[in-house]
């Protein structure tokens, strides 16, 4: 009996092998022995990676933002971020509440009516931090985001490469990874 479906079977097998070779997104590790007091202070959001539709639509117009991380009264962290939006500086503060081992936090976004879990995956405290955020409850589909925090507005090449490797390990594609352009607006340093 002839096997007219043999070419289709070959394509199907190649497709299955391609799927099997595509790395599945993995959960980010957590910074061992996270020291919250060393994490405090000024950070610049230098890189982002995400699978969310809003990010993919807006990624070309995003720019670097400045964040101040300070202890909160309840033991969590207040993260006050200043960024450029429609040619004006905008500031928002998030309360990160402890949510598990040190370095794990959660916050609720009043804007999106969603809850997010944030993990500090890796940091040297003085130069960079790699964060992983997952939306866990909300009206829309779950979304994932990796963030590169840098203590300066110009992270070193090896820090950028570390972030790219981190983002890829979480399943993000090149299209979903962006290094945010530096801007002079809203970045002034107050003493």
UniProtKB/Swiss-Prot annotation:
- GO BP term (any one): mast cell degranulation
**Signal peptide segment:** 1-24
Tell me which EC number(s) this protein carries: 5.3.99.2
Q: Which domain of life is it from?
A: Eukaryota
**Where is this chain's protein located in or outside the cell?**
Rough endoplasmic reticulum; Nucleus membrane; Golgi apparatus; Cytoplasm, Perinuclear region
The task this protein performs is described as: Catalyzes the conversion of PGH2 to PGD2, a prostaglandin involved in smooth muscle contraction/relaxation and a potent inhibitor of platelet aggregation. Involved in a variety of CNS functions, such as sedation, NREM sleep and PGE2-induced allodynia, and may have an anti-apoptotic role in oligodendrocytes. Binds small non-substrate lipophilic molecules, including biliverdin, bilirubin, retinal, retinoic acid and thyroid hormone, and may act as a scavenger for harmful hydrophobic molecules and as a secretory retinoid and thyroid hormone transporter.
Q: What's the entry's take on its domains?
A: Forms a beta-barrel structure that accommodates hydrophobic ligands in its interior.
Protein name (Swiss-Prot/TrEMBL): Prostaglandin-H2 D-isomerase
Q: Which organism is it from?
A: Ovis aries (Sheep)
């Amino acid at each position: 009996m002839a096997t007219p479906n043999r070419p289709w079977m070959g394509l199907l097998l190649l497709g299955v092998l391609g799927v099997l070779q595509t790395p599945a997104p993995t959960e980010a590790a957590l910074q061992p022995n996270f020291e919250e007091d060393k994490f405090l202070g000024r950070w610049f959001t230098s890189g982002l990676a995400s699978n969310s539709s809003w990010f993919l639509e807006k990624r070309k117009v995003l720019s670097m933002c400045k964040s101040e991380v300070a202890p909160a009264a309840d033991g969590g962290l207040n993260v006050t971020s200043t960024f450029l939006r429609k040619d004006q500086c905008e500031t928002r503060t998030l309360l990160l509440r402890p949510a598990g081992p040190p370095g794990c936090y959660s916050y609720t976004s009043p804007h999106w009516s969603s809850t997010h879990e944030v993990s500090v995956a890796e940091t040297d405290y003085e130069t960079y931090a790699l964060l992983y955020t997952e939306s866990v409850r909300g009206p829309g589909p779950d979304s994932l985001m990796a963030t590169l925090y840098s203590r300066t507005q110009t992270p070193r090449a090896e820090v950028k490469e570390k972030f790219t490797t981190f983002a890829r390990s979480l399943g993000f594609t090149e299209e979903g990874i962006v290094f945010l352009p530096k801007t002079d607006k809203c970045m002034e340093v107050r003493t």
